[in-house]
Amino acid sequence: MKKEVGDACRLEDIVTNLYRLETVKQINYHQYVPSKADNQWSIQAELFLRRKNPKVLAALFSRELWCFSINDDPLPELNLELNNESESPQPERKGHFTPEFSKPHLPTPYAIFMKALRRMIYVNLTLSSNETIVPFGNSCIFQESYTFSTKILHFDPHLFENGDLTVAICSKDLGLSKLNAESLKHEVAVYLAPSGIRVYLPSTDLKKCYVSPPKNAQMFLKTLFVSHGINLIDVDGLKWVKLIPNANHLNGFTPTISHYLDEPKGNNFVIWPACLCFVQTASDVQTPQYTAFSRSPQLELDDCFDMIDGFIQLKLTSAYRTPGTSAGMGTVTGHNPLSTGGIFTDQFQGFNKHSANNSNNVSSTGENGKFSPEYSNDPNVTPLRDNKTSRQNFPTESYSSNGFITTPIINENITPTVDDIITETPSVKPQNDLWNEKKDVINSTSNINSKDASVGSSERKVELETAFESPAQNISIEEHEHVEFDKDLFGEDSDEDVSTRNKNEELVSVKEITDEMFDLAEDDDEADGSTSNSLKFDRPDTIESIDTDEKKTRTKRTYLDIPVDVITIEKTPTLYEDPGAPLPIETPKDRKKSIFAPLNFNPIFESNVDNKYKNGGKFSVNSNTNDEPIQFGISTSNISSSEDDDSDFSPADFNNNGPSAGKGLSYDPRDNDIPMIESSTYEPIAKDSLPELINPPSSSKDDSVASYNTIGTLMEKPVKSNLDAIWKPALSKSERADLPNQTINGVINDCNNSSNSNPTTYFENTPSLGPDTLYDNSKPRSSSANFLSTVEIDPKSEQTIQTAEQEQSESSRILPYLLRHMPLFSLPDVFLCQNPSLPPGKDFEDILEILTDQIVFNNDMFSDDRATESQFKGIKDCSVGTISDTMNQLFGNFSKLHGNEIIEEVFYLPEPSVFVKKSEDTIKIKSSSCYFTEYLNLKPNRGVKNFRALVLTTEAKNDCMSFVSQMSQTYSNHELGFCELTKLTNDDNKGLIYLKNFNQDTLLLLSAQIVSFCSTALSNIKNIPLLIFLPINKLSLTECISMILKFHVIRKEFKSKLPKADILLRLVNIDFLKNPLTPITAYTSLCMAIYNSLPPKSTKVTSLTNDLPKQIEFRTLKNASLSIHYDNYIHLAYLRSIDREWLCAAWSDTKGVESFVKTWYVGNSRTRFEQVCNDIWKITLQLASKNFGNVCLVLTRLDSVLPDDELIHWRRLSVATKDLHLAVVCVGDNTKLTLFDEDKTYPTFKNLFRTKSNPQTGISNSIDDLEIINIDEEVHGLIFSNPLQLANSQHRCAIKSGALIRFAKSEGDNFIDKFEVNLLNCPHADSSTLLKEILKQYRNLAGLNPWFGVSYGKDNFIPWHVVAVKNVMNSIVHVKSSFEKETHIID
């Protein structure tokens, strides 16, 4: 591999997801400030401009309105009228800025311009996409019309120094889906679109959350249309839901992730369209493994064999023949396709007749469901909860009803691996639809009973109707619950049925089949002619008591090949009847009945009934009662750095209390001891306090602008508020007479139909938006301008408002959630529904230190279970489709940028060397040799570490003995030190203690034995640490913390008796112990991780070598420069969670000799955060004191963001330290910029992966000319031509940007792994030189990942201390904790 890349790498073959929009010379702007501080003039003015022209570049900043134009384009004009007198507001500030703006702090006009640009793009995309794209926060959501799945679509604009106005287009999968009653779960988080604010459902039953439209619904829909391009004005049957918003998120603070699903504490609510609500499911929710769209081949094969086996057994064991039929008419079964002519035997009696029969199949279960896969102990059994995974889906049109014939599985000697479902033959005519219905009801209602036992009968009825609409699930429940539920559902006959089934079924005799057994099914035949589909259950009145009617004329029924005890119900006494009661009145068929009571309850209230019942009862609530308006907590935070937090207006902008509004600015959720202070009310704006905004002039050069203006001519009602003035301008009668009457309901319907009938495919692994993908604009449609111009509001659809105050208060309530845009960065990628917790108290720090050590230096053991963030994926091709058409209409030059246009230099970074010992000699080897240490007989260069090992377990005793023996032998063979297997008593095994349980009493007794043993050992030999091994059954954070708490009981007791002795913990996966094929390399990695965790922890297995300088530079007075030469570097990487609850930091010197990782619980407290910053700086100074000369601290902040409050503390601390120079760097491996590798020749190892169609070229035949390399360790450095804006900060830009990249392994892998590095300050040094040095040191520190046991393969090109912080934060953010003092007791 060349060390000088030169021309070997073709930069033009590196494709980006950046697109050029315009070539900018200057950006012009006007700033408008309202004359009064207590009005909503800025909001109304922006809506006025956006209604006038959807392409306007305008945005709000606090109470200010900013308007922009590019180059020589005119600025938007505000032509308003006051009392028919023309008056144009004058801008408070005029100016312009050029691409050569200051860095790293971006000017305010630039940040607001980027917001206005992104807003304009989203509005026009929404208008031109048939509403498949909806704005969401500072991003937008693409909704596939035929599924509920969505993808985040993000546009990240940036203005380069060379004048290129660019935008990075990328996508991200947050797992969002539309709010749906059928798929709604308890473990979901709900967000509002277009604001992206976190809200909560008041009830898990979505039907209870549906409410009538608010009184200002039409005004809201109009504002939504103009402000975001979302047209819901003419949507029929628009549903509204009542939601509880999160006040902290509205103020720019992410809700605590570990409590993300906790019930809301506030009583405020907001009413929102249900179609604009999106849900995100917790990552630890169990989902069915197979669905109707993805089936296991093994599952289908088992289905086929089960069907064949059941059919053969049925033919051999048929019991009786149907009267009037024959079995010898040319076939085995005769003319009757339902008869097999065999004999029934007792083996049918184990078949459970309460199986769910849906989708033309039936689940065959054993007694009490013991053979159901859901309750099977067989690990190979897969529970099928979704009936979509049926064997066959026969069209219901082929039969007169959806009933079916059930054929049980006979082979009871083999444990089933799947639901034994047998599908009917297509020619079968179902005969007993009524019994099929009853069995469906039993299983469907079982689901409801298992969800919530407190649900009333009315709620259960609603749930049951919902269950009828979707396939029912076959879920077995406990025997007692099943009996009680059948009794409530069907009366005493079901009791006898269940009790009979629960007995020993081998003693039940098979009765002779007679015509009486078909009485119940006989009644159902009459209803069969009027009901085309018995499984639709549109009317629950089909579920009635079976024995209430008299027997009708009996006829010969076609014989069914189903056991008698399965298809029939024994004769039972009728339900209780009062002889003195009047005759019941027959209920109409179309009236829904309750299935939860044996008697129908149909009260008829006469005219003289008590008024309290007539009005709905004593607890009824008048529907006309108005709720109190929502109250917002006002935040004083001006230090948020997440994209639009500062550029958006705060809820205080909607508070019209004048001077008293400032009193609400004392709330800061970062201080736990300060309560939230909310504004009492949001008074409406006086009617005459502002000028009424009239309809803008219709004359325009752009037809789209003129057609867009016609929306204002459609509202002719009197103005009730200044917000109404935007929609209802005051026009004279003569002017009204001249307005054309436009009606376009049909156009809107056509647009809606076209959007639903246009199936689209979203991004693949390598997104490419071509003609056949999501943005294909093949459907004919009107332009966005015509679409807007066709809107006509029916005046009759607007609800009459009782008072102006009520309407205005509702407008004040809903405006913040409509016009506020939360940054996507403030939403967690993943969250859990079951969060572990750490006990607060004096032992909290010790437990947190142990947890951090287990996460970082344990061979990335929790990498599979750890909830990782979703990655941004750039859009590679966007040349055809809606995006391309929209962007070409908005901008004059929409074209893709290639690598040679944004990359200044690419250089190869060689693999670092490390120190190790072989025999007694210290040698240097490549860092990738870590994977071959067991073959090279290497040992650490900094001495050996001895320890005692003891495994504590309650299971797998023999496996644990084998493990501890193998581990001890491996540790000694690699000369890492000596491992002694501890034996507490003579009766114990070496290195193993087998416990009955991990109760606290058992652990305390064990700790006493350990103290006794170590006390004797310490008196004879030097202090040797005791390492406790605890196997865990599941690689989860919850299990890890549970075992750490158990270990802490032992450690606490141990330390109280022997404070100078060391006792450590090492968690081991139980599968690692039990697997007999665990490779020796896994044991080697484990032993190296143990070595790194033994005291002193700063001493690791290896360290980086010192590179000899290639040339010596002499600094004299003549060539002296202002740049400072740094003799040593200290690296500090840290990350604070987005909810501000946790902070993790890691230190390392340039050689990896000094290393340290620590985690703090900040608790969203400003005081606590300041203390943590002081602790970090104190540790840093201790490391700096060990170095000489000028020391540079490379302060690395992850997540490509640097909040203002953090920067303030670093400046405060660095000013007081003269000998330590601070270089602030923001890094991230998940940024919006994506690079695609289309170079077929570079790097040279790509030639080894060529296919037959593309043969290998340029490979030498001599093996001596080749070098063995690890492709994962081949890293290059990259310097961008222009500095990049921070990915998650709208107002900060780097002074120099670069990246560590790892090229694709072959031609097919297009994505280039990228670790973006942005230098924010350069203390007395050249920025390019300093950035290259930092990239080089980052690459060297990345070589320590496998040696330190931090990462293998995936993140090996990222520095180890950055990977360590990221791994800790991905796990620790889901842990609950607090500062309260509590006593924690182990169960």
Swiss-Prot record:
**What family does the database annotate?**
Belongs to the Mediator complex subunit 13 family.
Give me the gene this protein comes from: SSN2
Q: Which organism is it from?
A: Kluyveromyces lactis (strain ATCC 8585 / CBS 2359 / DSM 70799 / NBRC 1267 / NRRL Y-1140 / WM37)
Q: What does this protein do?
A: Component of the SRB8-11 complex. The SRB8-11 complex is a regulatory module of the Mediator complex which is itself involved in regulation of basal and activated RNA polymerase II-dependent transcription. The SRB8-11 complex may be involved in the transcriptional repression of a subset of genes regulated by Mediator. It may inhibit the association of the Mediator complex with RNA polymerase II to form the holoenzyme complex.
Start and end residues of each stretch annotated as Disordered: 81-102, 354-400, 620-676
UniProt lineage: Eukaryota, Fungi, Dikarya, Ascomycota, Saccharomycotina
* Cellular localization per UniProt: Nucleus
Q: What is this protein called?
A: Mediator of RNA polymerase II transcription subunit 13
Q: GO: which molecular function terms?
A: transcription coactivator activity
Tell me, in one coarse class, where this protein mainly resides.
nucleus
User: What residue spans carry the Polar residues bias annotation?
Assistant: 354-367, 390-400
What InterPro entries does its record include?
Med13_C (IPR009401), Mediator_complx_sub13 (IPR051139), Mediator_Med13_N (IPR021643)
**Matching PANTHER family:** MEDIATOR OF RNA POLYMERASE II TRANSCRIPTION SUBUNIT 13
Q: How does it assemble?
A: Component of the SRB8-11 complex, which itself associates with the Mediator complex.
Q: Which UniProt keywords apply?
A: Activator, Nucleus, Repressor, Transcription, Transcription regulation
One GO term describing the cellular component: mediator complex
Q: Does the record's keyword annotation contain Secreted? A: no
Q: One matching Pfam family, short form?
A: Med13_C
What does the record list as GO biological process?
Answer: positive regulation of transcription by RNA polymerase II
